[in-house]
Amino acid sequence: CFGGGSNFGGISFPFMRHNILEGKKTRFVAAEPASCPKLTRGKFQYDFGDEAGYTPLLPMFTLGHNFAPAHIHAGGLRYHGAGVIVSQLLKDNLMEAVDIQQLESFEAGCLFAQMEGIIPAPESCHAIAAAVREANKCKETG
């Protein structure tokens, strides 16, 4: 799941060096809520990291520090911008991003709970939904 980038960065950054240094072709896909699509619909520009405008201006994919996202169940994913490092990686095409509708994320979370016996957090359901999309693409294409 992707809110500001720490979760995504923590899991993907250790592996990205293989793509950069060794020419591997691993895909890194961030899954963000469609109601707060800073990576898929935001602009790469300098913006404040906080709503009040107290931080220095930072280069990021952003919806604008005044953006007020809809109230969604995954409250941790409502941040207006993406971290500086993640933003640069997306700008440099070293990663991808998809947006996930809330209902699709909940359906994926229910499927995961039924199959694995673990109830995921609403935020994590976005990443699960993206994984289900990828699995279905592979099923269709062979």
Give the predicted meaning of each segment.
Residues 3-12, 38-40, 124-131:
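Short glycine/serine/threonine-rich phosphate/pyrophosphate-binding segments
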Residues 8-11, 15, 54, 58, ...:
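Basic, gly/Ser/Thr/Pro-rich low-complexity segments located predominantly at protein N termini
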